[in-house]
A protein has these predicted regions:
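Conserved C-terminal structural/oligomerization subdomain of aldehyde/semialdehyde dehydrogenase
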Residues: 1-92
Length: 92
């Protein structure tokens, strides 16, 4: 069971969705590609599903924002959190 809400504008949807203190995942339905991009960019969530539930794969980063925590797991983005990046410049 999931609650459904009706909104008049995209701005209302984004504002209502972003009022939560956590930001692990969100899903929404839309047909228009430009609308999908606008809403996705406005949402403060680590993962966003469009017209589907979220499917986890080894190439998809699992991430959090807000009080869900910070960081990424999975994919190269998650691996990079565990690496120490160094730069070296040598001349011979």
């Amino acid at each position: 069971m999931a609650p459904l809400f009706r909104f008049e504008t995209e701005a209302e949807v984004i504002e209502a969705a972003n009022t939560t203190i956590v930001g692990l995942a969100s899903c929404f339905c839309a047909r228009d590609h430009a609308r999908i991009i606008r809403v996705h960019e406005g949402l403060e969530y680590g993962m966003v599903g469009v017209n589907t539930g979220l499917v986890s794969t080894e190439v998809a980063p699992l991430g959090w924002v807000k009080q869900s925590g910070l960081g990424r797991e999975g994919s190269r983005h998650g691996i990079e959190d565990y690496l120490e990046l160094k730069y070296i410049c040598t001349g011979f």
